[in-house]
Structure formats: structure tokens, C-alpha cells
Amino acid sequence: MKNQLNEITSKLVFAIALGCLSQTVKAEPFHWNAFDLKVSPKNVGPLLALLDETFAAPDKPFKVTLSETIFSDNDVTHGLTVSSADVDAISALMSDEFKDGREQFMANLYQLAEVKSKYTGVRTFTTNIPEKGSDAKKAGSYFGHWEIEIKAADAPQFIESFKNVVSATKDLRTNHILGMGMFQFGKGKSTHYILHSFNSYSDLKKGLEAYSQKEAMAVHFKTIKEIATPVGSQVFKIIKQW
């Protein structure tokens, strides 16, 4: 893995760990570090160019994803995430060995974007796992993302109810990803998240309507109403994944 990381370093500057199929729920966890960004329209192109040049190596032990925020209750315009099933890959990115390159990358990033927040977590469950892994995301796809607060003692009950929903709604998903994960640091009251992929904006709107017609959803919401508190939601569109 060290040789792979050294190869990436030589491209421009070293990549930073920023801040970091079946129709049944599967455990193929991966770790991720994320930045919420505010990028002016004139800097979107240069940001893409920076990421293209930095993360061009094809055999990285991690993925880097840039997304555009479509709907949210804040002024974040883009999201940047580094993810890997191998936590050591992300750890290596953050090590002193690559300190100089990491700081140079950050300096370049700060010239193009305002960093609104940094946080880290782990995806614990994913359905319809893509061929390239649980963290693979297709350019142009939309994702609905819901943040919730759950007390640790109530998490098993929530997860069990979530699994029931997945089983009861599998007919609504063909190539769609439905996942659940945990925030570990940097997200305030939010402890868990649910996300769902959609092929287009129309697919998103029609998909949400289809879910609302399922009895399993009503049962789920009744089950979790005393143990899960909604914190926020957003829709984002994948620009590119390296």
C-alpha cells in the first residue's frame, strides 16, 4: 500500500484524508472522512482540475468523491469525501510521513473553497452493493441523506426496524443503494444517517412517493418515533469519483 501512496504523491501533491449484490442488508463497512465546502461558481472548474491531477492514480486503496449539494438548510455547495474499507489506508493519508504533501493539498483547497465543517464516520450497512464496493457512487446519480440522533441503548431496536423496512421494500430497488451508517466525530447531535441513491431527480421524487405508500414505512416510523430524532436532511448529486 505504501508504494501506491507514493505513486499518488508524485502526481501533484499528496491526497489528504479530508478532515477522512443482494437485496438484503449486508455488512460491508467502510470508513470515510468528509468536508462540507462552499465553492463559488468560478472555482468549481479549478477544484475539479485539482482533484483530477491529485487523485488520477487508478489503483488507490481509497476513493475520493466530489458532490454538489442540491437541497439543504445551509449554505454548503459541495461535499468532498475520502472513503475506504481499509482504515489503514486513510490512516496512512493522515500520517506524518505525508505531512508536507497533505498540507500543500490543503493550502490549494483553501484557495478554492471555504471549509464549512469536517467530520468522520463509518457506513455499516449497504444494499445492492456495487461491483466496485459499498462506497462506489456513479457520476450523475442523486442521493437523499437523512441525519438522525439515536441513543446508544436504542440503536439495536432502530437497526432491527431498519432491516424490516429493507426487506419489505426491496421491490422498490433495482440498482439503488440504501445504506445506514454512524457519525463518529464532528456532527454535533447527529449520531446516524440513512442514504438512498436515485438515478435522476425524477427517480428521487417518484421513489419517495413509492416508499410513502408502503405499510412497512408507517410501521417503521411508529416504531422509532420515541427513539430517533430527525436532525437534518439533504439531497446531493455526484459530480465525480476518483
Task: Identify what each model region corresponds to.
Residues 2-13:
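Bacterial N-terminal signal peptides that target proteins for export
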Residues 26-218, 223-242:
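Short S/T/G/P-rich N-terminal loop/turn motif that feeds into the first structured element of a domain
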